[in-house]
A protein has these predicted regions:
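Extended two-metal-dependent nuclease catalytic cores across DNA- and RNA-processing enzymes
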Residues: 1-77
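Active-site-proximal helix-loop-helix substrate-binding element of RNase H-like nuclease domains
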Residues: 1-15, 124-130, 168-305, 313-323, ...
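Short, conserved charged micro-motifs
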Residues: 189-193, 368, 677-684
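Conserved catalytic core of nucleic-acid polymerases
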Residues: 321, 325-328, 404-407, 432, ...
Length: 699
C-alpha cells in the first residue's frame, strides 16, 4: 500500500486523468518496483529494463515522473487541529439525522450506521421482552390474560403488494410486558376464531408500524382489523415530514435511545435471551412489537405538544384503511388497447429517431449527452446551455429553451423522440403492473411528500400526462370493470387558489370565485382593467401563471422566463396584481414572517412543516426555505381537504349502502367505479362531501 502512488504513476489513474505507460499493467509495474526497490531507483536504471514494456517505459518516462509528482501527497501542511482533536468521540445522532435528512443522503446514512459499532447506536440498550410461542389451543387464554387492557403492539410477518397479501405470523406485545408469537399458518379453528375476534374488536387498542400493508394481508385471511390506535410510521411522519424514511429501528434509537434488540436482564433470571424458544424471526418480531408500544407513547406525547395528535387520529390513521380499500379494488384496464398504444409509441420513437438522423445526415446515439453536446454546440453551433461537470447540459428544460430560441428541426425531432420514449415507458410500466384480475393495483404512500400530498407507486398513476392528446390516450386505457356501469371522476377546480382566497381573506379573489365565471379570466379583467369578455387568451395566460406561481414563491424573473417576456414587464404585472389583490401579498409576507418566528408553517388542519433554514446565514438555503414556507400551507391544506373528502365519501358510501366504490386519488381528483343504477345518487353524494370537506369562505 505504501507504494501505491508509485504503482499509479506507472499504470495511470483514471480518476485523476493520469495516463499510464502503454503495455504496462499492475503486475508488471509491481514486479519492477520490487526489483528496483522503488520508482526513483527504477527511473534511474530505466535503460536496464528489457522487452517491449521496457521500451514503452522509456518512451513515456517523462509522463511517469510527472504522474508521481502530481499524485504525491502534501506532507508538510499545517493542520488547524491537533491529533487529539481528531480522536473519535461520541456523536450527536439527532444532528446527523437532521443533516442527512436535509441533504437527502438516505443511502449514505444507512452505510454510516452499518459502520458504527453497536455501542455507538444507543445509550440505553434494547427492549425488555419475555416472549413465548402460543401453543395450539392457547390463543384465547393468552389474549384474555394479557391483551384486554392497554395498547397491544403488533408486528406482522408475511408479504403484501399490489392490493393483496398473506400473513405467516403475528407478534404481540402486551402492556403488562408479556409477548407472544402466533404462527398463523398452523392455527386450529378455535385459535383462528379467537384471534380473529380479538383482532376485529374496536375496544382492544392496537399499535402498529406501517399498518396499511399488513392490513391487506389481514383481509386476505378473511380477518378484520379494529381498534388501531396508533401507527408509529404516520406519527413520526407528522412530526418530521421532511425526513422521507421512517424505519422502525432508526426511530427507536432517535426517540427512545434504544436499539431493536433484547435488553440485558430482560428475563426474570437476568438472562439476555428472554425467550422460551430459539427462533430469530419470531424473536425479532416480538422485539419490534414491544418497540412499537414504547415508540407510540413517545411520539404521541410529542404530537400532542405540537398539536398534531388530532390530525393523526382523525385523518391519517383512518385514511390508511381507505387507501388499503382502494389498493385492493384496483382499476380495470383494456389490455389489448395498452398493447396497441405501446406499439404506436414505439413506432413514433423510431420515426422521430429517423427524422433526427435525416437532419444530421448520419445516425448518432440520441441518448448520449456527450454525442449530443458535440452535435448541438460544436457541429450545429447552437447557443450554449448551462454548464455542468460533464459539459453543457442537454436536459429537457434546457433543450426546450434552446428550441424556442433556434427552432432547429433537429431539436424538434430530438424532443419528440424523448417525449415518445417517456410515453412508451409509461405504458410499459402499466403493462407490467396488470394483475391476474386484469386490474392495476397501485400502492399509495402517505409519508413521502413533506406537504402531506399522497404519492402513488408501483405503478405511479399520478404521473400520467393529461395535458397532451397522447397523454390523454393513456388515460383511455382505464376502463370500468365487470359488474359496474361506468367510471366517474370528480376533482377540485383551482383548489390551491381557493385556499389562497380563504386564507388571505382577499375580497377580490373571493368575489372571483363567487361569480361562478372562469376564475383566471375574472382575475385578469381586474388586473388589466378590462371587462371579463374583453380578456384575451394572452392576458388570461399571464394571470393564470401568476395565480398558480404565487404559492411557489414566483419571482419577477421566474415569471418573465415562464411567459417569455421582459423582466420589467413581469415586475410591472406582479405589481398590478398585488394592487388589485393586496391581501394576497400581505398573506404571503405573513406566512414567511410567522414561519421564521415560530420555525414552522401550518395548514388548515394544523399540519406542520418545520423549516430551520429560514434563519440560515446561507442565502441560497434561506431562499429555498422561504419558497417552501410559501408553498407548504397551500399544498398542505389542499392535501388536508382531499384527504377529509376521501374519508367523508367513503363513510357516506357505506352509510347509504352503495356498491359504487372509490378507486383512485390523482392529485386533486377522485375516480369512482359506479354500480348500476347508482350514478345520480353517487354524483350528489360526492358533490356534497367534496364540497363540504372543509368549510371555507369560497364555494
Amino acid at each position: 500500500p505504501s507504494r501505491y502512488p508509485e504503482l499509479a504513476a506507472l499504470v495511470g489513474e483514471s480518476s485523476d486523468n493520469l495516463p499510464g505507460v502503454p503495455g504496462v499493467g499492475p503486475k508488471t509495474a509491481a514486479k519492477w518496483l520490487d526489483a528496483y526497490d522503488g520508482l526513483e531507483n527504477l527511473v534511474r536504471h530505466a535503460d536496464e529494463v528489457g522487452g517491449k514494456a521496457g521500451e514503452s517505459f522509456r518512451a513515456h518516462l517523462d509522463d511517469v515522473v510527472r504522474n508521481r509528482r502530481l499524485n504525491a501527497l502534501v506532507g508538510d501542511l499545517e493542520l488547524p487541529v491537533s491529533v487529539e482533536e481528531l480522536t473519535r468521540r461520541d456523536w450527536n445522532r439527532e444532528a446527523v439525522h437532521d443533516l442527512f435528512d436535509g441533504l437527502e443522503f438516505r443511502v449514505l446514512r444507512d452505510r454510516l450506521l452499518e459502520t458504527l459499532p453497536a455501542e455507538d447506536l444507543t445509550s440505553e440498550g434494547g427492549f425488555e421482552v419475555e416472549g413465548e410461542v402460543l401453543p395450539t389451543g392457547g390463543v384465547r387464554a393468552w389474549l384474555d390474560a394479557h391483551a384486554r387492557a392497554g395498547v397491544v403492539g403488533l408486528d406482522c410477518q408475511g408479504r403484501w403488494r399490489a392490493g393483496a397479501g398473506d400473513l405467516t405470523g403475528v407478534a404481540l406485545a402486551a402492556a403488562d410486558g408479556a409477548a407472544a408469537w402466533l404462527d398463523v399458518t398452523t392455527l386450529s379453528p378455535d385459535d383462528d376464531a379467537a384471534f380473529a375476534e380479538w383482532l376485529a374488536d374496536e375496544s382492544a387498542a392496537k399499535a402498529m408500524h406501517d399498518a396499511k400493508g399488513p392490513l391487506l394481508a389481514i383481509w386476505s385471511r378473511g380477518w378484520e382489523l379494529g381498534g388501531l390506535a396508533s401507527d408509529t410510521q404516520l406519527a413520526a411522519y407528522l412530526l418530521r415530514p421532511d425526513q422521507r424514511v421512517y424505519d422502525l429501528a432508526d426511530l427507536t434509537v432517535r426517540h427512545l435511545r434504544r436499539d431493536l434488540s433484547v435488553a440485558a436482564g430482560g428475563a426474570d433470571d437476568g438472562d439476555q435471551a428472554a425467550f422460551s424458544f430459539d427462533d430469530t424471526e419470531s424473536n425479532d418480531a416480538m422485539v419490534r412489537a414491544r418497540a412499537v408500544i414504547d415508540l407510540a407513547t413517545a411520539l404521541e406525547t410529542e404530537l400532542e405538544e405540537r398539536g398534531g395528535a388530532q390530525l393523526l387520529r382523525e385523518v391519517e390513521l383512518p385514511l390508511t384503511r381507505t387507501l388499503a380499500t382502494m389498493e385492493r379494488a384496483g382499476i380495470a384496464v383494456d389490455l389489448d388497447y395498452l398493447h396497441r398504444l405501446h406499439a404506436d409509441f414505439d413506432s413514433a420513437v423510431v420515426a422521430a429517431e429517423a427524422d433526427a438522423f435525416a437532419v444530421l445526415g448520419r445516425p448518432i446515439n440520441l441518448g448520449s449527452p456527450m454525442q449530443l453536446q458535440a452535435v448541438l454546440f460544436d457541429e450545429l453551433g447552437m447557443p450554449k446551455t448551462r454548464r455542468t461537470k460533464t459539459g453543457w447540459t442537454t436536459d429537457a428544460e434546457s433543450l426546450e429553451t434552446l428550441f424556442a430560441k433556434t427552432e432547429h428541426p433537429f431539436l424538434a425531432h430530438l424532443l419528440r423522440h424523448r417525449d415518445q420514449i417517456r410515453l412508451r415507458q409509461t405504458v410499459e410500466g402499466l403493462l407490467k403492473s396488470v394483475a391476474d384480475d386484469g386490474r392495476i393495483h397501485t400502492t399509495y404512500v402517505q409519508t413521502i411528500a413533506a406537504t402531506g400530498r399522497l404519492s402513488s407507486t408501483d405503478p405511479n398513476l399520478q404521473n400520467i400526462p393529461i395535458r397532451t392528446e397522447e397523454g390523454r390516450r393513456i388515460r383511455e386505457a382505464f376502463v370500468v370493470g365487470a359488474a359496474y356501469e361506468t367510471l366517474l371522476t370528480a376533482d377540485y377546480s383551482q383548489i390551491e387558489m381557493r385556499i389562497m382566497a380563504d386564507r388571505s381573506e382577499d375580497d377580490g379573489l373571493i368575489e372571483a370565485f363567487a361569480s361562478g365565471q372562469d376564475f383566471h379570466s375574472i382575475t385578469a379583467s381586474r388586473v388589466f382593467g378590462v371587462p371579463a369578455d374583453a380578456v384575451t387568451g394572452a392576458m388570461r395566460a399571464k394571470i393564470k401563471a401568476m395565480n398558480y406561481g404565487l404559492a411557489y414563491g414566483l419571482s419577477a424573473f421566474g415569471l418573465s422566463q415562464q411567459l417569455k417576456i421582459e423582466r420589467s414587464e413581469a415586475a410591472g404585472l406582479m405589481e398590478e396584481y398585488f394592487e388589485r389583490f393586496g391581501h394576497v401579498r400581505d398573506y404571503l409576507h405573513e406566512i414567511v414572517a410567522t414561519a421564521r418566528r415560530t420555525g414552522y408553517t401550518e395548514t388548515i388542519l394544523g399540519r406542520r412543516r418545520y423549516l430551520p433554514d429560514l434563519t440560515s446565514s446561507n442565502r441560497q438555503r434561506r431562499e429555498m426555505a422561504e419558497r417552501a414556507a410559501l408553498n407548504a400551507p397551500i399544498q398542505g391544506s389542499a392535501a388536508d381537504v382531499i384527504k377529509v373528502a376521501m374519508l367523508d365519501v367513503e363513510a357516506a358510501l357505506a352509510r347509504n349502502g352503495l356498491r359504487s366504490r372509490m378507486l383512485l386519488q390523482v392529485h386533486d381528483e377522485l375516480v369512482f367505479e359506479v354500480a348500476a343504477g347508482e350514478r345520480e345518487q353517487l354524483e350528489a353524494l360526492v358533490r356534497d362531501k367534496m364540497g363540504h370537506a372543509v368549510e371555507m369562505r369560497v364555494p
